[in-house]
């Protein structure tokens, strides 16, 4: 049954607000390799650094930055970073981390992606970056592309690091003699996928259950809306 998008976003926010400290300094910190990251390990994949190219002195906006470890990894590469996330708890953790590693020119803003242009007062950036596992928490991919088009400078770059939605669509299914992967849901579904789950992806044993809602976007939809909205970049 279709869910109300605003109610879905509120439930997601409640979950992310609760889990931010768990991921940053609680039982989920091992999953995030916080200790290693604080010691200098980058959260960026080698191909991200290679494909984005030199960022020294460039302005970089990280949408849906969560606790800021990816954002601050870009700071370590020399970018002037702005991180944006709708979870106040996550932004507090990001600001705490910036202080811990001595990055004083990064800023973090509490805002939904749809409100980013207003929240950032129309500022434009050399690079707009979105990391893996972020788009599925947005209810409108066309709106995302439109917002990005207003945030990227002429001649700038939108960089999206994302995995195929097929990964989330598959789950193991028991069959005689073992198990096989089957589809959890229809990849052509355009409604939210809602579920109640225990723990966190960073700590499956974390107590309590949370209801979450996500929207899966096929590559063709993402590429099409990005191309239509960002034709001159």
What kind of feature is each model-predicted range?
Residues 166, 207-222:
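Acceptor-substrate binding/catalytic loop of class I
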Residues 226-232:
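Conserved small/polar residues in nucleotide/adenosyl-binding loops
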Residues 30-58:
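Conserved alpha-helix/loop element of class I SAM-dependent methyltransferases that forms part
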Residues 142-154:
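A short glycine-rich, Lys/Arg-flanked "PGG" loop and its adjoining helix->strand segment in the class I
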Residues 59-116:
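Class I SAM-dependent methyltransferase SAM/SAH-binding core
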Residues 157-200:
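Conserved class I S-adenosyl-L-methionine
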Residues 126-142:
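A short SAM/SAH-binding and catalytic strip from SAM-dependent methyltransferases
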